[in-house]
């Protein structure tokens, strides 16, 4: 990465001076830069033209980080691996002023590499799209624009001071680019005694304040502040909490439309659902029963809210805690909450040393679509784990005083989350249907390969750098308490050539995506290859796919097997999605952002089966329930976390005719876009009989 006058972080042990390139005068660099940018249709910068720039056409130039002395040789020809959509995503959100794509990748690699060789390999992995750092690392690695971590978990204590402390911490976290998951289950419910002379107002008014604070605070310069709130299934206010994001019904002053929410589900509750038993709602303070309700009625309420609004997220807390790291079990550290995307499961609150913890996790993801390219590279995953270790250290060194509890937690457990993207893309590239034993076999093989590599890397790093304090305290040789977590990867999957996000199936084979620079038509690249082979890659075919809600099931020239391979997310039986998620659960230290997709005509038993089987088969958490409807419904905040597959599908009777227009024009006029899936009404959802 080529940067001039990069600000130094005075608190950091890692200095961030500019990268320099020799061999060109300022005027020559300006001319080369202008020529190269014009080749890809970009305007040259209008300011700071005397700042040296890397010319795309000058391959194999060495870029040196003058502070660390580390040198990275960049290859501008690798820009060709980026799609137009990926380029626009980088330009809209992640490039610094005057920075090229390869310079960005080199900036991150050189800053977090151990030495020249490690930095070079990291650059090669990123630029070849084998893996991609999480977006805060891309945005902020090697500069003072923000922190390289944006994932935080905390909890509110049952006192006014505890509540205000949480608000204050969340303001600072959001202001510095943090996404927050907060646990509110410690607070007494509405009407319980306070000091023997008063009654509590419950959790909702305090969550409402957090809702307003979240809306007011921006995350860096890239996105609005975001937060999720979590409550256990036995809290006395759970019934109102489930409906807190529903925009209609109830007191509008007791709604929190700008927050996301999740529910911690216990095994005992699910057994009560199985047995059609009663369920006690208990005071968090003294465990006295405040109310008793039928377990199934509460379960139905949860499912109804998920189908109609997409939330709450579900976290099966006993499964999560049973699989937490051994050192956390020995220390009595409990996992009570999750994050914005339900894949981070780390302990919060007061630890065994009497200190408060705000959990922190730094993320990056390998690209499974490129699995055949990196599977036999013995350095690949160990290099990434060293990279993540340096990222977490960067946060520890540079976290401001307002994040002391987060820095403490990061120092004690050093949890990271290496995830994946491109699973469905890999299946499709290799002609493998999602629904089948071949997909199950590859799913296990790939995740077992990753698990073995990260486990060995953690142990090897513990020998070299020392075990993390939480593990060392009990004689356990682990550099990281947690090593893996599967995030949604909405943005970085776009950067990686349009790989399918996370472990999620592709939602449509053609759709439009809006960016700050315009609207892009996105076609399934693997399907396009198949259509080319069959001589069917033309606008007429793509428009017919568009008219069929992104589906290829109507294409007579495809075989049944090919139609199975290119089923969309909503066409896949979700029980297969749960099955694959369950198979890899024990190979992932934390959890996985797992959406389920529900067609508008789904029967009630199918909806129940999906969610019930997730618990029964040992899945740790469920993210959104993406439901389809013919008519758009209100679902709350316009600032919802979105992925590129969150599409609004066209009305059944709204067919798009070509009329001489290009496919891009047709897609732009259609309603296939990146909006949220609409909600479908299941107001009278009833639970089927459980055998």
Feature names for model-found ranges:
Residues 1-148, 299-303, 308, 612, ...:
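Acidic/polar, glycine-rich intrinsically disordered N-terminal extensions of enzymes
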Residues 118-122, 180-182, 221-228, 314-316, ...:
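Flexible, glycine/charged-enriched surface loops at secondary-structure junctions
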Residues 36, 48-116, 187, 191, ...:
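Conserved, charged catalytic cores of large soluble enzymes
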Residues 154, 183-187, 231-234, 241, ...:
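Generic beta-strand/beta-sheet core signal
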Residues 81, 341-350, 392-397, 484-646:
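Catalytic alpha/beta core of large soluble enzyme barrels
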